[in-house]
């Protein structure tokens, strides 16, 4: 019998914040048990350090440049199969509880059921404009300044509903006459900023030494060009937060992880209570990481380890606990789910591989590279990343290149791009970028997509509105973000 698959996804969780990845203070007993009894992929990366595009590449097993979805307001075609499509063809009942950030009329992309509304807009509200990029109403320094304790926030409201619906679905499946195995994706918004948590989770870190950034805030001159643009976009350029502000934000981030852990525990308890745990693969990951003050940077949108490296844990009763050091990324999930489910062969080439091929190997396969890209706001040109063995290469035709040796320089402080001894490696990486991506064609496609979506957005905001959001109710425009309010006014609406 094919196994059930429970896919737990969180938002903006950097791998290094979990004990399974070396942290010393995180209180996350449910995730700790999952890691102790499962497979921990030590070097897992997202393929695009931004919420929606990361999910698109993960769902399709392809890079966003290949599926034509470039930012947080992009849709990918309904004809592109996702893991939900492949699993349904293999006989699975597929359901989604929580955030997936689908844009456009197709709000299912292969899922049979959606148990909640999405947290964010499904329209083109957030289309970037490379031709005339201005300050957008998104991340800003208030996320750090207001960090601390709250009783309730919109993110708490949302994740409580996500958990309730997921638990209810597990019980519904146990009572159902539907004999198909299930695939349930439970997708949370924590620990995404603002850095707020309830007092009971804040108090878990009383007396703990909160780990401060290893690399303190850099001067504008010491930052790479993309970091400077991001800091300008966040309204943080030239701001040096006090140590107590940084510590408070990081403590609240840990508190959010602990809160998240308590929700995940409820879902796992339901799995055990129904007996489904005996035949269920549990997969846990995040869409991307969080800079968390390193180099004076916050949030995501860059290729530094804090923003790019994500936790990836797979647990099943019949899979031996182990740690895998090979490079992996989120595009590997589609072929892995397909392998577990016995899905038909993919109809097109995929970027990812089956992670099960990396387990218990006396002779592990040669290390393949991991690719990532950034094609969204706050850049005038595509930025590409290749991680091959210990080296990370970041390339932008506008900004130049960076090369880091992560074994010798884990904090990514020494750019080796101009090092004479590293020139053969730099040239090889440059050639790999040219082979992997046709930048001229990609830029043309991105600019045209932005113009098209901006026009459609303006048209849809004129006259009678027809919303794409799944199951949209009148109150959703108040509860969840729909572009009616300013983003930060909505995100910081807490008590």
Question: Where are the predicted features?
Answer:
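A contiguous, mid-protein "functional segment" used to position or interact
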Residues: 417-465
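Residues forming the ATP-binding cleft of Hanks-type serine/threonine protein kinase domains
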Residues: 407
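Formylglycine-dependent sulfatase
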Residues: 1-396, 401, 410-431, 464-495
């Amino acid at each position: 019998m094919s196994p059930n698959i429970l896919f737990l996804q969180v938002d903006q969780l950097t791998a290094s914040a979990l004990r399974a990845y070396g942290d010393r203070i995180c209180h996350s007993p449910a995730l700790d048990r999952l890691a102790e009894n499962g497979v921990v992929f030590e070097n897992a990366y997202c393929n695009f350090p931004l919420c929606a595009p990361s999910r698109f590449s993960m769902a399709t097993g392809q890079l966003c440049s290949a599926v034509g979805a470039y930012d947080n307001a992009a849709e990918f075609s309904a004809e592109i199969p996702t893991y939900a499509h492949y699993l349904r063809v293999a006989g699975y009942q597929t359901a989604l509880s929580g955030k997936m950030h689908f844009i456009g009329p197709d709000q299912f992309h292969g899922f049979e059921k959606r148990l909640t509304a999405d947290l964010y807009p499904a329209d083109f509200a957030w289309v970037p404009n490379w031709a005339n990029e201005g300050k957008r109403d998104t991340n800003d320094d208030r996320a750090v300044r207001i960090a601390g304790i709250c009783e309730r926030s919109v993110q708490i409201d949302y994740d409580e509903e996500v958990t309730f619906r997921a638990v209810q679905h597990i019980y519904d499946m146990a009572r159902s006459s539907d004999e198909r195995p299930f695939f349930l994706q439970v997708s949370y918004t924590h620990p995404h900023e603002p850095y707020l948590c309830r007092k009971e989770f804040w108090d878990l870190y009383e007396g703990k030494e909160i780990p401060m950034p290893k690399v303190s805030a850099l001067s504008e001159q010491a930052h790479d060009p993309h970091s400077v643009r991001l800091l300008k976009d966040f309204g943080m350029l030239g701001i040096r937060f006090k140590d107590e502000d940084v510590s408070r934000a990081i403590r609240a981030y840990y508190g959010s992880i602990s809160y998240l852990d308590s929700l995940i525990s409820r879902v796992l308890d339901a799995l055990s209570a129904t007996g489904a745990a005996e035949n269920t693969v549990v997969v846990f990951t995040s869409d991307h990481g969080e800079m968390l003050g390193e180099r004076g940077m916050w949030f995501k949108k860059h290729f530094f380890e804090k923003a790019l490296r994500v936790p990836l844990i797979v647990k099943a009763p019949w899979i031996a606990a182990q740690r895998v050091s090979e490079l992996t990324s989120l595009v590997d999930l589609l072929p892995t789910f397909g392998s577990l489910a016995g899905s038909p062969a993919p109809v097109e080439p995929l970027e990812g591989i089956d992670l099960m091929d990396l387990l218990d190997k006396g002779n592990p396969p040669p290390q393949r590279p991991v690719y990532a890209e950034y094609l969204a706001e706050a850049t005038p040109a595509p930025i590409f990343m290749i991680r091959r063995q210990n080296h990370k290469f970041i390339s932008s035709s506008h900004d130049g290149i960076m090369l880091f040796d992560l074994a010798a320089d884990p904090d990514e402080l020494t750019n080796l791009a101009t090092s004479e001894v590293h020139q053969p490696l730099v040239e090889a990486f440059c050639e790999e970028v040219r082979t992997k991506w046709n930048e001229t064609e990609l830029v043309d496609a991105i600019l045209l997509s932005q113009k098209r979506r901006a026009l459609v957005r303006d048209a849809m905001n004129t006259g009678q509105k027809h919303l794409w959001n799944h199951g949209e109710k009148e109150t959703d425009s108040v509860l969840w973000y729909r572009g009616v309010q300013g983003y930060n006014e909505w995100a910081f609406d807490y008590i």
